């Protein structure tokens, strides 16, 4: 054992253990509260057989350690060992069976004792041997037991007006790609970020899909975690199921996301090389996934305000280096559902050129502008339209990956120092390789799609093309007049009057609003055939993707003309997601009223064809979808009840999930439902055949001389995706081809071993890679990790010493002239960092929760969770982290009357004389 591993003095107390013993204990229960796993903890003290629950329950394992002074315990799910006395993870000699040795690597320097466990550099020089894939790992056939008594039919108890959450969770639970990830790759649900939503979701999925099939479970842990992050869901009022979905998916993405470094192809044209900074506010008004036909002049003129305050609706979180987020506001939901994520190919800019010319001819000398949004700034790429005839490759959609998420950042100034260089395009500049940061998670892999939208000025013919990532499509429900226009049109993308889709979404006065309210009430009381044809989901999609004339009060602010101009706006899908989430905009919220559109929308259970909405040059091959689940709302806008209809993937039957009640229903019942949110999954019989073929090959188990390591995450895609894409082993490899030191401790959770014949078949079919026959800890990454940790340690020490010195000086002041207030939430994050409890420094100072503006002045919010520091301390912290705003308290100055002061002095003199 190395000196580093021997640093824990309590390892000598470990008794003799075997892997079989731990497996047997993992199938048991906590000896105190009788709760089952996962994540039970077994005491490793010699001759102690105690097994207790962890933090997700009552944490009896910690209580046992405190009472008995037994410091070492092992997690029976991950087999990782924790020492309570040393407050860190420790590594045992291999007592659980022989493991292949790795080449010796330089041992890391000893790290500060109170440093957080996850940024300690794993010092074990061996890796656990990953399991060999067996038939069950790739088996897609349903067991006879599951056909007779299908799993996943467990209800969720209502814990106080939480039907919105229960319906959303059941709908997500019946999305096989996501659920199978947590069931088959549960070891990947690890995070240091609080409140660890991914761990709570893993526990919930394990309970819902357990073979014992309990009648119902209580999602308390998950609900408490979400309420901690998002105050919207606190209390007992009814909330929106779609907002909960977006919040949950965003939190899961944030906790599970991984940064991937990728080198561009040398022939690619990097967007950064042609970027020019453009602060025009009008450029923000492009396609929103809320509706292609929604544009607002006010938002054109006030684009810079799109990252501000409130948290009622959603906006996007484009990933870079940031972590946390909150929900956004109502009007942002209409315009900011998407931001640019990826740039696929310059040929994509040509995709709608022919259809554009139907309205007006393009001038070959004009410029097509591609606008790329990021959280730090805006990027504008100008491409001459005469280049559009020759498609050139821009960075692939794997290279630049700012990503749509469910919520905006905590504050506007959350990303200091993230403004990348803006360079003027050089026509003759040499192509060069370049690295881009990108993030991905199981959420983005499953739910992210891409839309290409264009706005053309009808005066100067300038076309602005925007590529946007969406996680769901919010579709308007067209009215009778809109349906007539859509159905009478011979072209599927013919122009529809701006704002006409769903007249309820246009600005209205009080009288118009009241008349519309009465009209809707009457409509809801009269059979739909009286009012016209039935609205279908295809109608809603057609209305969403319809061309939109920008004129009148809805004119387009042209950057070239520098004026408001008439324009035309349209969009198509460049990349469809594996699971398409569709939200029907049934609710409309005014200042004092809320209304609901109760129009029935007909939707198919199978064979939703999205070919008419696919971009011309899109590489997508599968555009047909089958319904997985649908969330329904019964009632009015102010009150009601949510339920979910879901198709069980094991027996293909439909069930109604109404809180803790689960009932089988017919397909006609589902089709007659008042759909609010729908989940569709790509349909591919070819993918099913390929999975059966590989499963049969694996069952044969031909002897092979070589074993190949493959990513568990990619195998999950192969089992559940219609288009799994190329094999990707980058989730367990570093850029040097080895295993990153941080992942060495749980490599068995990341990979499986395949026989050579299975690897050859998968590789020939899907490509990708790289092929891996040997696992080793990367020496280069280990050295880099040591250097990074050394710098962090020095930074912590410096910041802590300066703060203590400044704070002591502040405490000695008798009557300071000013106090600076600081958010205690941010301060606790900073304190955890400088004390070594958290591996990463906090973001910018965020005083928005403790500040309130009155009469133009920033004041301390009453009852705010804040602390007081000196001006020098504030300047010190602000110079490092930035942020704000400044919240200053000035003690009142007591003005003493001069006559009173003179009288007091006279009395004092007389007293002395006596």
Curated annotation (Swiss-Prot):
What family name appears in the similarity comment? Belongs to the peptidase C19 family. USP20/USP33 subfamily.
Q: Give yes or no: UniProt keyword tRNA-binding.
A: no
The family database entries (InterPro entries) matched by this protein are listed as:
DUSP-like_sf (IPR035927), Papain-like_cys_pep_sf (IPR038765), Pept_C19_DUSP (IPR006615), Peptidase_C19_UCH (IPR001394), Ub_carboxyl-term_hydrolase (IPR050185), USP_CS (IPR018200), USP_dom (IPR028889), Znf_RING/FYVE/PHD (IPR013083)
Binding of Zn(2+) 3 occurs at 43, 48, 64, 70
The protein, known as: Ubiquitin carboxyl-terminal hydrolase 33
According to its record, what are the GO cellular component terms?
Answer: centrosome; perinuclear region of cytoplasm
* Positions contributing to Zn(2+) 2 binding: 30, 33, 53, 60
What PANTHER family does the entry give? UBIQUITIN CARBOXYL-TERMINAL HYDROLASE, UBIQUITIN CARBOXYL-TERMINAL HYDROLASE 33
The gene behind this protein is USP33
Pfam families cross-referenced by the UniProt entry: DUSP (PF06337), UCH (PF00443), zf-UBP (PF02148)
The species this protein was found in: Pongo abelii
């Amino acid at each position: 054992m190395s000196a580093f591993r021997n640093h824990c003095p309590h390892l000598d107390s470990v008794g003799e253990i075997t892997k079989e013993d731990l497996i047997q204990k993992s199938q048991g229960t906590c000896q105190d509260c009788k709760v089952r796993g996962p994540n039970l903890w077994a005491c490793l003290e010699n001759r102690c057989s105690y097994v207790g629950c962890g933090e997700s329950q009552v944490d009896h394992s910690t209580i046992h350690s405190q009472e008995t002074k037994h410091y070492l315990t092992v997690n029976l799910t991950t087999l990782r060992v924790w020492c309570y006395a040393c407050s860190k993870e420790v590594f045992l000699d291999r007592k659980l069976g022989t493991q292949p040795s790795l080449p010796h690597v330089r041992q890391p320097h000893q790290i500060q004792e109170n440093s957080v466990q996850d940024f300690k550099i794993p010092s074990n020089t061996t890796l656990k041997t990953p399991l060999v894939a067996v038939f069950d790992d790739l088996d897609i056939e349903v067991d006879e037991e599951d056909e007779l008594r299908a799993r996943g039919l467990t209800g969720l108890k209502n814990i106080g007006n939480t039907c919105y959450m229960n319906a959303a969770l059941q709908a997500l639970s019946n999305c096989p790609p996501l659920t199978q990830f947590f069931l088959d790759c549960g070891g990947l649900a690890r995070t240091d970020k609080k409140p660890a939503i991914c761990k709570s979701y893993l526990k919930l999925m394990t309970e819902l899909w357990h073979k014992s099939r309990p009648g119902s479970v209580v999602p308390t842990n998950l609900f408490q975690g979400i309420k901690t992050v998002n105050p919207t869901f606190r209390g007992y009022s009814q909330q929106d199921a779609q907002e909960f979905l977006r919040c949950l998916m965003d939190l899961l993405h944030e906790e599970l996301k991984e940064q991937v470094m990728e080198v561009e192809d040398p022939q690619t044209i990097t967007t950064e090389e042609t970027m020019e900074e453009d602060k025009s506010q009008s450029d923000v008004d492009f396609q929103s996934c809320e509706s292609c036909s929604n544009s607002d002049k006010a938002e054109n003129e006030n684009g810079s305000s799109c990252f501000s305050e409130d948290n009622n609706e959603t906006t996007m979180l484009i990933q870079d280096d940031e972590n946390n987020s909150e929900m956004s506001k109502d009007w942002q939901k209409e315009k900011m559902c998407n931001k640019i994520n990826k740039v696929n190919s310059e040929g994509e800019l040509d995709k709608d050129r022919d259809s554009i010319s139907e309205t007006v001819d393009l001038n070959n000398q004009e410029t097509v502008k591609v606008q790329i949004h990021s959280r730090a700034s805006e990027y504008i790429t100008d491409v001459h339209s005469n280049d559009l005839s020759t498609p050139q490759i821009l960075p692939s959609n794997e290279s630049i990956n700012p990503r749509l998420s469910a919520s905006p950042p905590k504050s506007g100034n959350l990303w200091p120092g993230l403004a990348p260089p803006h360079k003027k395009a050089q026509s003759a500049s040499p192509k060069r390789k370049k690295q881009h940061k990108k993030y991905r998670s199981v959420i983005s892999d499953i739910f992210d799609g891409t839309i290409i939208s264009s706005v053309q000025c009808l005066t100067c013919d300038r076309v602005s093309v925007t590529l946007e990532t969406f996680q769901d499509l919010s579709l308007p429900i067209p009215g009778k007049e809109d349906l007539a226009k859509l159905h009478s049109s011979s072209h599927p993308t013919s122009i529809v009057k701006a704002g006409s889709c769903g007249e309820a979404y246009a600005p209205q006065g009080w009288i118009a609003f009241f008349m519309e309210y009465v009209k809707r009430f009457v409509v809801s009381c009269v059979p739909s055939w009286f009012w016209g044809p039935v609205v279908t989901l295809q109608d809603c999609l057609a209305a969403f993707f319809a061309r939109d004339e920008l004129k009148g009060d809805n004119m387009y602010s042209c950057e070239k003309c520098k004026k408001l101009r008439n324009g035309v706006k349209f969009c198509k899908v460049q990349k469809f997601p594996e699971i398409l989430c569709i939200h029907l905009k049934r609710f409309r919220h005014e200042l004092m009223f809320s209304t609901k559109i109760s129009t029935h929308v007909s939707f198919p259970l199978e064979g939703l064809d999205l070919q008419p909405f696919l971009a011309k040059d899109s590489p997508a091959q599968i555009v047909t979808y089958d319904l997985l689940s649908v969330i329904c709302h019964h009632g009015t806008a102010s009150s009601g009840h949510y339920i979910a209809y879901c198709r069980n993937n094991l027996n293909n039957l439909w069930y109604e999930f109404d809180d803790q009640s689960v009932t089988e229903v017919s397909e006609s019942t589902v089709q007659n439902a008042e759909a609010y949110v729908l989940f569709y999954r790509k349909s591919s019989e070819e993918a099913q055949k390929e999975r059966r073929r590989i499963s049969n090959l694996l069952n044969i188990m031909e002897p092979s001389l070589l074993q190949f390591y493959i990513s568990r995450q990619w195998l999950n895609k192969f089992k559940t995706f219609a288009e799994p894409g190329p094999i990707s082993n980058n989730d367990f490899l570093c850029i040097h081809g080895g295993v990153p030191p941080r992942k060495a401790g749980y490599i068995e959770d990341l990979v499986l071993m395949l026989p050579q014949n299975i690897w050859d078949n998968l590789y020939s079919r899907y490509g990708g890679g790289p092929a891996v026959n040997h696992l080793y800890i990367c020496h280069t990454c280990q050295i880099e990790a040591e250097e990074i940790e050394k710098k962090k340690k020095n930074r912590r020490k410096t910041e802590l010493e300066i703060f203590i010195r400044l704070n002591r000086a502040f405490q000695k002041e008798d009557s300071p002239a000013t106090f600076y207030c600081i958010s205690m939430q941010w301060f606790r994050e900073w304190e955890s960092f400088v004390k070594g409890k958290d591996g990463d420094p906090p973001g910018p100072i965020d005083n928005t929760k403790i500040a309130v503006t009155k009469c133009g002045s920033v004041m301390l919010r009453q009852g705010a969770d804040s602390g007081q520091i000196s001006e020098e301390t504030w300047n010190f912290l602000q110079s490092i982290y930035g942020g704000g705003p400044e919240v200053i308290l000035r003690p009142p100055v007591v003005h003493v009357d001069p006559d009173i002061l003179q009288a007091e002095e006279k009395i004092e003199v007389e007293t002395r004389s006596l």
